[in-house]
């Protein structure tokens, strides 16, 4: 319980920090219009996306022959008995799952209650990206049925079609990494969203967010739960989930999800009471 309390405290600190940043630090942030009014003209998928996807696939294939090497190196007594590495891996693992989801939902809830549009916007779109990444990852895990290194560190080639769908078969749901996907989905969503508010901020926000996501991925390798190629493919899925969710919402500002959850209908009645409802349209 003490360990869980420590994780919760860190999440509260991180969420508070993100909230202060998102609510508008400095006059530049305050002078900019609400993010939800920004309409992107970019197509959902571009040629650049194809090149990025090919890069991730190439990286996954390139690392595959080295999976066993990295797994062995990380499981040496020197690394596993290092208290600093143990604590760091535990913290980042929690930040990946369930921490990222807690932060996303928390930011959305606080943003709605406090009427901080940007915080609610980021929380909602970030949470959507996490759910999309998680759904995709779990589908691929079930199909691939790859054995985790903790099942047999000498057999990185153990793939059995559909094995990951069987109940109680978590040891055979290694590819791709869910924690990695969640970390990179959060990083991509935050980077994409904030780049629309503060175009010149990407140079420092992106390294911080993607650096944290990389640490989440590395923690799973350290814990012997994933091979190197697992975390690269998880990073690919998360990155695309985060960027595409944000791009979709900003190119379709009238979509139902944003209308329902970011812009509820508020009506003041003659008796002075206020009614709040969802702005649902029917066609």
Give the location of each predicted region.
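Interfacial/capping segments of alpha-helical transmembrane domains
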Residues: 68-80
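Short, glycine/alanine-rich hydrophobic alpha-helices that insert into or span membranes
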Residues: 53-61, 104-107
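Long, highly hydrophobic alpha-helical transmembrane signal-anchor segments
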Residues: 103-121
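Flexible, solvent-exposed coil segments and beta strand-coil junctions
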Residues: 36-37, 80-84
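Interfacial helix-start motif at the membrane-water boundary
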Residues: 83-103
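Alpha-helical transmembrane segments of multi-pass membrane proteins
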Residues: 59-71
């Amino acid at each position: 319980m003490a360990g869980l309390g420590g994780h919760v405290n860190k999440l509260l600190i991180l969420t508070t920090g993100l909230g202060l940043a998102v609510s508008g630090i400095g006059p530049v942030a305050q002078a900019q219009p609400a993010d939800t009014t920004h309409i992107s003209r970019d197509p959902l998928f571009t040629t650049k996306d194809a090149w990025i996807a090919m890069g991730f696939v190439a990286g996954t294939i390139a690392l595959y022959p080295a999976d066993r090497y990295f797994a062995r190196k990380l499981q040496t007594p020197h690394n596993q008995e290092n208290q600093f590495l143990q604590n760091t891996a535990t913290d980042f693992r929690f930040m990946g799952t369930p921490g990222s989801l807690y932060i996303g939902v928390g930011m959305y809830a606080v943003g709605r209650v406090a009427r901080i549009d940007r915080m609610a916007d980021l929380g909602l779109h970030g949470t959507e990206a996490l759910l999309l990444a998680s759904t995709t990852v779990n589908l691929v895990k079930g199909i691939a049925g790859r054995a985790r290194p903790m099942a047999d560190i000498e057999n990185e080639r153990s793939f059995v079609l559909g094995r990951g769908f069987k109940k109680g078969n978590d040891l055979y749901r290694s590819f791709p990494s869910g924690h990695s996907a969640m970390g990179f989905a959060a990083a991509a969503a935050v980077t994409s969203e904030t780049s629309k508010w503060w175009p010149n901020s990407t140079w420092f926000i992106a390294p911080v967010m993607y650096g944290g996501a990389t640490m989440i991925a590395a923690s799973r390798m350290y814990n012997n739960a994933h091979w190197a190629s697992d975390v690269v493919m998880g990073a690919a899925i998360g990155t695309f989930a985060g960027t595409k969710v944000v791009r979709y919402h900003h190119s379709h500002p009238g979509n139902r999800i944003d209308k329902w959850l970011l812009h509820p209908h508020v009506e003041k009645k003659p008796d002075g009471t206020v009614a709040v409802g969802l702005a649902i349209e029917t066609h």
